[in-house]
Amino acid sequence: MPRTKVFYFIPNLQQGGPEGQILELINRLPQRFEAVLCVYHGDNVFWGNRCPPGQPAHDLGVRSMNMAALDRLTDILRREKPAIVHSYRDKANFWARWAASRAGVPITITGCRNRMMGLRYLATEWFLQRKSKVILANSIGVKQELVRWARVRDDKVRVIYNLLDVDFFRPPTAAERADARTRWQLAPGTRALLLPGRIGIQKHQLGLLAAMRTLARRGKWPQDAVVLFAGRARDKLTSALVRRFARSPGLASAVRFLDAVKDIRSLYWASDLLVMPSLYEGLANAALEGCAAGLPAILSHAANVDAIVQPGATGWEVPTLRHAPLVEALEAALATTPERLAEMGRAGRAHVTARFAPRKDHVLDQMVAVYDELLTAD
């Protein structure tokens, strides 16, 4: 029986949740599907260890799309003759729909995985939605933004959460935690607060630093606490501001920059608390993974729209872009006993497992069901 070809399109494979998710999906697809991956460019591949042999199959060789790249993409689709085009990220969605329409691909699925979409994208989405059989969102918040601001039909958007491997992202044994802390040079007794994600406006590292400074000025930032920023620079200006702020008196010894971390699980294992005061998110993949690994978490409301954290039981939720509540949550977390934090972490793992990964292939089965539904209807 011939395999069904699915053509995946994403700008690149640099550090980021969508990039990891698309490769996880390709790796776990049933054998009756044949995956073909195409990127704008193959530079600075962060997820190389997850790439199946021969992927990405196509590299357009551009940093940003243009008409010549659109022609190349259209030609590739005509040669590959996929049954489905499935694109990830806003700009890729625009070009994928255009190329798929030109090439006569019968089914196009577009994936929106973050909020605060560009104004141009929102402005064109109302018209372009007719080129997508289905628009997949990974968060209730993303769907709400598409329906409210882009005027996409409610029934056109379906929410399928991120793939979460709770067998891999699990709490460490005592020996694994000790090894992880040694690897990340955390001395005995040091409390590690982890903010994973690219350095930029979205993840709001500046907000966390401001809250730390407030506690330090009040004499309430503990000498044994350190914040770990794990992520590449998203943009030069914000990254420079974050690093300059981190050198402020009272903060310099309490902040470490780790750049992009490939073995993120070991960093979860080494840490004591996850902190993500994001200004906007789709479904925060790092929050899911960290909680599955047994970390209690402080999340902004923007990062917790899909109820990753249960306030008071598995962590803290703070209003987005509010300084005082973040200060209060940090102070409360730092005053919480290790035993209570561990209890919250165990409850957090149970919660995210039940909500986002109740069985091994829960999300994969939902994705495959969408493919099968559209193939049957076509």
Predicted segments with their positions:
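A conserved, positively charged/aromatic
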Residues: V105-I140, Q144-R151
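Aromatic "clamp/platform" in nucleotide-sugar-dependent glycosyltransferases that forms part
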Residues: A260, L279
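Short hydrophobic beta-strand element within catalytic cores of glycosyltransferases
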Residues: P296-S300, V309
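Short, structured helix-loop element that forms part of the nucleotide-activated donor/catalytic region
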Residues: N44-C51, V226-A252
